[in-house]
């Protein structure tokens, strides 16, 4: 399958799932101004890990998972946190690429759409950003944490909404997680760590104690 077909298959699979999910369309409708843009694929150590993770078995959205995996070899994998002190383990095992937006094969003025992958026993520390955000679990599960809210474990089909600059974090346990993630408004500012939340919450130490690396 050539790259163009992989991108098209990914877009249509994402569109189908997105438009069929009320919480996503309420967040922001799937854009009508989607247009193709040039993309330079960028490899990432996490790509092979993601493509070979047999624990990802989406019953809810098998076509979307297959399309996300299928586009992985020709995606521009993001390195959002490469200039931070997060460490090599996080940088090599956290996976994200854009579907609609900067670095993605498609562009829109209304939305940014990403895939996010985390292997089993993985911790994504507290962070925040001006853009409002919604996560949809495609396959697997994860513990979602956000400021001033109770923790919750989300399964395929469930969502987590993050307000502008609301700190949030994630952790996987016995299984990985694959998510479709949408942003609206204030796309220009990337996420930054919220280290004081890790200290106050004790999440990092607790996660490590439970076997989350």
Protein language model regions, located:
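Active-site scaffold segments
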Residues: 135, 159-162, 178-181
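Short, conserved beta-strand element in jelly-roll/cupin
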Residues: 110, 115-121, 128-144
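Double-stranded beta-helix
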Residues: 7-8, 173-213
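A short, N-terminal "cap"/entry segment at the start of jelly-roll beta-barrel domains
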Residues: 2-109, 207-210
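Surface loops and adjacent helix of pleckstrin homology
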Residues: 129, 147-149, 173, 182
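Short beta-turn/strand-loop junction motif enriched in small, turn-promoting residues
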Residues: 102-104, 122-123, 166-168
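Short acidic-glycine-tyrosine-enriched beta hairpin
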Residues: 148-167
């Amino acid at each position: 399958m050539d790259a163009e077909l992989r991108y098209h298959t990914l877009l249509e699979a994402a569109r189908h799932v997105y438009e069929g999910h009320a919480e996503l369309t309420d967040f922001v409708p799937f854009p009508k101004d989607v247009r193709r843009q040039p993309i330079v694929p960028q490899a990432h150590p996490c790509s092979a890990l993601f493509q070979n993770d047999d624990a990802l078995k989406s019953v809810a959205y098998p076509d979307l998972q297959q399309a996300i995996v299928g586009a992985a070899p020709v995606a521009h994998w993001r390195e959002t946190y490469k200039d931070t002190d997060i460490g090599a383990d996080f940088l090599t095992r956290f996976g994200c690429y854009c579907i609609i937006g900067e670095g993605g094969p498609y562009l829109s003025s209304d939305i940014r759409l990403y895939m996010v992958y985390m292997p089993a026993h993985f911790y994504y520390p507290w962070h925040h950003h001006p853009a409002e955000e919604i996560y949809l679990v495609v396959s697997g599960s994860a513990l979602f944490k956000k400021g001033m809210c109770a923790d919750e474990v989300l399964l395929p089909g469930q969502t987590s909404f993050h307000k502008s600059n609301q700190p949030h974090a994630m952790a996987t346990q016995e299984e990985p997680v694959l998510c479709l993630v949408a942003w609206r408004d204030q796309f220009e500012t990337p996420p930054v760590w919220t280290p004081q939340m890790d200290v106050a919450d004790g999440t990092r130490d607790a996660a490590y104690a439970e076997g989350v690396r």
